[in-house]
Amino acid sequence: MSARDFVEGEAMLDEEENEEELVDDYGDGEERLETGGNHYDSSEEDEDEDDDEDAVRAVREGFIVDEDEEEEERAERRRERRKRRREEREREDEHLDEEDLELIGELNPGLQYAAAADSKFKRLKRGHKDRDSRQPSQAINDFFNSDEEDEPAPDYGRHRRHPGDEMDDFIEEDVFSDDELQREREDLEVARPRKTIGFGATDTTGLDENALEDMRAAFGDGNEYDFALAMEEEEEQQEEDVEKHLDLKDVFEPSQLAEKMLTEEDNQIRLIDEPERHQIARKPYRNVVLSEDQFREEAAWIANLMLLKKRLEPELREPFQRSVAKVLEFLVTDDWEVPFIFQHRKDYMIHTVKVPVNGASADDSSSQYTIKAEKLLNMTDLWDIFDYDLKFKALVEKRNTIQKTYDNIRSVFSVEDPIVEEMLPIATTMEELQDIQDYLHFQYASQIRDLTLTNGDTNGEVQRRKALTRNFFERVRNSKAYGLVRAFGITADAFAQNALKEGRRQYTEDASERPEDMADGLVDNDFNNSSQVLKAAKGMFAEEIVMSPKMRKVIRQAYYMNGAVDCFRTEKGLRRIDEQHPYYEFKYLRDQQLSDIARSPELFLRMLKAEEEGLIEVKVRFENFENFRKRLYPNIESDNYSELADSWNRLRREAVDLALGKLERVINRSVKENIRQECENHVAKECREAFSQRLDQAPYKPKGMILGTVPRVLALSTGTGIIGRAPIHWAYVEEDGRVLENGKFTDLSLGDKDRGIADGKDLEALVELVNRRRPDVIGVSGMSPETRRLYKLLTEIVDAKDLRGALYTDDRDEEVSDRLEVVIVNDEVARLYQNSDRAKKDHPSFAPLTHYCVGLAKYLQSPLKEYASLGRDIVSIQFKPGQQLVAQELLLKQLETALVDMVNLVGVDINEAVSDPATANLLPYVCGLGPRKAAHLLKIVNMTGGVVNSRFSLLGVGVQYPAMGVKVWNNSASFLYIDYESADADSDPLDNTRVHPEDYDIARKMAADALELDEEDIKAETDENGPGAIVRKLFREDAQDRVNDLILEEYAEQLEKNLNQRKRATLETIRAELQQPYEELRKHFVFLSTDDIFTMLTGETAQTLAEGMVVPISIKSIRDDHIEGKLDCGVDALVGESEMTDRYDIPVRAIYSLHQTVPAKVMFLNRKTFTCNVSLREEQVSRPSRPAADRAHAGEWDYRQEEQDREALEAKTQDGGRTMRVIKHPLFRPFNSTQAVEFLGSQSRGDVVIRPSSKGPDHLAVTWKVADGIFQHIDVLELDKENEFSVGRTLKVGGRFTYSDLDDLIFNHVKAMAKKVDEMMLHEKYQEGSKDSTYQWLETYTKANPRRSAYAFCIDPKHAGYFFLCFKAGEHAQVHSWPVKVIPQGYELQRNPYPDMRALCNGFKLLFTNMQSGKRR
């Protein structure tokens, strides 16, 4: 098979003819396996069995680590010696026993039979084993049988193994009853019979008692040393027990432990008293400790970076810097997380100024004034500071590494380098540090190499490569030619200083003779003529300019000021990117300024994606580079006027040109990468902002209830079905989240009494359900525009049947009810929930669409809980265009911060979290916690009774089971609330507020002042009813409004004066919480806009479906004056009489047929009604709109190149002389390969598109979806055609398969192969992921099971319709792979067909075994 068959868009050629080329592409299986060379000889295995036992055990216990190897080896040798001694004793015992038996047998012939029988039985067993090893069929069955574990012979010397033992590590302490312990001991005694060395009973020796007594007196009874043997055996048993102790890592794969967060590192995170998110983020920088000076430097560094993006008044800059420094101190020194700082240290983020009233003096304390407050930092800024802190630590770590290298060079070689000493302390970016590091390795290459060799750290290939690349410049530096470099009259650093315009200008001095003449006198063995000397010196000086940190800084600054981005289509892009392609927007885009890129970061990321796909080349260039070059020349030239000066200046300019060429390439790469990172960060933050807006909505508010009340919901949906044909699934969900009822309705149509039309059969049941359950709202959603019809139907039913919600008391204290509201619900979470494992676990008996309805209802009840429940799947939701182009971890990190912000704004009822999994999903986002600490908290609460009575009970000080440490408690306390029970004397009302326990005394003082209690009253109340008595009294007397009378300014001043605490904003929070504890601060539930509903139900956005675009429509009805059709997205299309055709001489029905798919141009789109007007006229269809090009500004779009490409493509089309072919088949689309792939991208696996072929009128192309991102293009040859436009009566695929029509081909070829692909991907041996990850799995498996061979299948993404069969014949063998081809009848491996997966696996084993046997011969 040729290479171009595997390129997307090309149909398959004759498979029979090209099979060998595919084999060559993969490599010949047998030749590749020869390097593995693993022969399976049973005799060799038997000989090595003892030697390998210990290695096997070591691998299984931990994949053999290098730590403490010597100690382990010594222990292993001791165990081996004891094992050998024990085996020798047992052999001696057996030998003696046989002699005794022979002796006894002579005296007692009747006993000989038993011994003989036993001996015969042993021989039979050995013979059976030998016979098995010689049977090849058995070897084939056992080969690669990794799922069937070898069954070891029973070992009665080991502990009894219970089925549940692998779960031991999940159990804290199992306490067994005395009976169980006794049974265990009895089992052990039976399992390990004690072998004693001594004389047998009298009836087996033939000696009388007296003779025995004499013998014992002379020789002893054989038990004199039993105590020593018993001690040794006990010691050995203890060692065996230690060795047999299983950790989780012995039972589970490392990836499984990491997924379940059960690794040792996870346990450390749980136990360390530090916020979990801080621990994870700071993990790479644990060893970086900042000095006080560095900490101050960091604060200034972060403030300066943030000021670039802030628009602050000059007088606010200094307060801003102080605020940043204080927040940094809270984050780093105090280990407070962002939500805590934002909630409880607000005063440090606000700058307040006292403004005197009526022009009084600000210094006059008696004058009146107002407070002018300026907010300096918001929540996003705090997260930015957290990120900047990590970046600064990375910066310091790299700087320390460079400083250490320089210190070593300076101390060993007595070198002082002013460039390093000047530039290193002031470097503020990673690029600048890298410049200094490159300079060091260039300037002191030999010294660093000597140091490296001295320290024994060769750094592998990287070090050797660096040594080779520096070799030429070291030769120049050590030769006479370097004298010519010095004669340039100025150093590279001085030249860069002039270019930077920093400090005093450095002047260039000319040498006393011309460069050529000087070069003649500098010839040596390295450079043996003047031209070589000149070339070497010029290259050396240019390299010194390139390596100058200051010069790189000059170029980098100029690049960012003068950078521009150009896009150039590749040959592949010329064909693939047509005017309907999403990349056409920048196919001919030129001269985009970096400021333009900053305004549309998503566009640049798409450019890079297109470049990655080989369709576009993105070039970042330096505008007016020639002018910049000319401006640099005066900084290196001398001011002298002479022929001598001219010759030197000419050489200097040549060196500068040489250096600038290399500098441009070096800086270009870093600039392009930096722009990409900035664009990714920008898009990720846009996603975070969009997610924050979706999170910032309270539950749907029932009529008459306060904001935050959870509604009762009835949710309905038809999914993708059509009303009247498909059932309507529904679910009723209570406010506590329980699904009390669910079912299906088939007919909810409203009747018409006047016309004698009865109501639908299920309408009465719906009305009865609503009247019985009294939901607060009806939620509707779906996956097609049919949902709009369901919404209208339900709205009409509510009006016609006067369906109302629950009763509530209005402002006049009367009980009323309102008509139910029907709401179209955002279903992005419900779509992910309906087929999730969580849904199956919650309601295993529900249908997927019922799960979907449950998801809709729960979204209405709490959007926050539903989003939090998604975990890492949150990235599946589309928040912003270009989101998929952002690194997933970066996106997850940004989205997590949005969840953290909102969860801590809302708070979590800790007792509800213990009993409700949906609420428990919020705990990982609580300040100070994370998934590990949250799980630990729930575990401890359940262990200690399952109820939390106060916030202080969570503090793990002096308790048996600490839920959290002091730091974590300080972070999380105010965000975990406990419902206040007025009947409970120990319940503290402040535990149900946002007030932090550190401020409880302030809150109680404010409550006492509001109640006008004096000190004696306060003491009496608290002595009698505890510290919370004052606030309870405030609540009990409904006197919360009195706190509004308090003058908080005085409180704040006293706190700052006496305790040095700034609490003005905190006092406002306390006042609000005393009036309404944990008030709902989120916005009202957000209803979807028209555009949002349109996108949700059709999947189309303003970018993918707009007026002027050409789209395929399926014709549903043909009339004389109009045609009705439907777009693929479900939008109804109407073709007016004037837009049906350009050929008025032919009847419309002769041109078009029902269910035919034709291209149409959208003339008008109504997103509210899901309808559009389209044109089928060739004149309109051939001129689609070009919104991308139309949006481009003059001078930024290469119209000339676009026109040239269009003319070239038209000429090619005319040469082909073909018209667009249309076939009457529901799967036909007038697509090219790219459009077919895009169309099938969102479809299911196995879906098909029939399309025209580029090979001519006697060919068709069939594209089908093999898997996500993998599509196969099949070339279909048509034979026996009636005419050029009809479909052939015989269809041939690959010269092997023949079909009678398209339906036969689709069903028996494509669908048959799709079934085989499903069978492969559902097989237990199939591995998700790439070939490399499958190789890694095989490596891991064979390390854990050294004596086993393993194989697995994985998909081949480059060759559609092929899979890899990857296998590894033992721990030390190489990993190999063979291609497996999917065919309609099954699979092909090594040109052998197999009907199913079982036959394929067996065939592979047989092929491999035969190949190995052939090698042995």
UniProtKB/Swiss-Prot annotation:
Keywords: Chromosome, Nucleus, SH2 domain, Transcription. InterPro entries: HHH_9 (IPR041692), NA-bd_OB-fold (IPR012340), RNaseH-like_sf (IPR012337), RuvA_2-like (IPR010994), SH2_dom_sf (IPR036860), Spt6-like_S1 (IPR049540), Spt6_acidic_N_dom (IPR028083), Spt6_death-like (IPR042066). The keyword Nucleus applies. GO terms for molecular function: DNA binding; histone binding; nucleosome binding; transcription antitermination factor activity, DNA binding. Residues 135-144 have a biased composition (Polar residues). Its main location: nucleus. Residues 1226-1326 form the SH2 domain. Residues 11-28, 43-54, 64-73, 166-179 have a biased composition (Acidic residues). GO terms for biological process: cellular response to stress; G1/S transition of mitotic cell cycle; negative regulation of transcription by RNA polymerase II; nucleosome assembly; nucleosome organization; poly(A)+ mRNA export from nucleus; positive regulation of transcription elongation by RNA polymerase II; regulation of mRNA 3'-end processing. It is found in: Nucleus; Chromosome. Residues 1108-1177 form the S1 motif domain. The keyword Protease does not apply. Residues 1188-1215 have a biased composition (Basic and acidic residues). Residues 1-109, 122-185, 1181-1215 are annotated as: Disordered. Pfam families: HHH_7, HHH_9, HTH_44, SH2_2, SPT6_acidic, Spt6_S1, Tex_central_region, YqgF. GO terms for cellular component: euchromatin; pericentric heterochromatin; transcription elongation factor complex. Histone H3-H4 chaperone that plays a role in maintenance of chromatin structure during RNA polymerase II transcription elongation thereby repressing transcription initiation from cryptic promoters. Mediates the reassembly of nucleosomes onto the promoters of at least a selected set of genes during repression; the nucleosome reassembly is essential for transcriptional repression. Essential for viability. Belongs to the SPT6 family. This is Transcription elongation factor spt6. It comes from Emericella nidulans (strain FGSC A4 / ATCC 38163 / CBS 112.46 / NRRL 194 / M139) (Aspergillus nidulans).
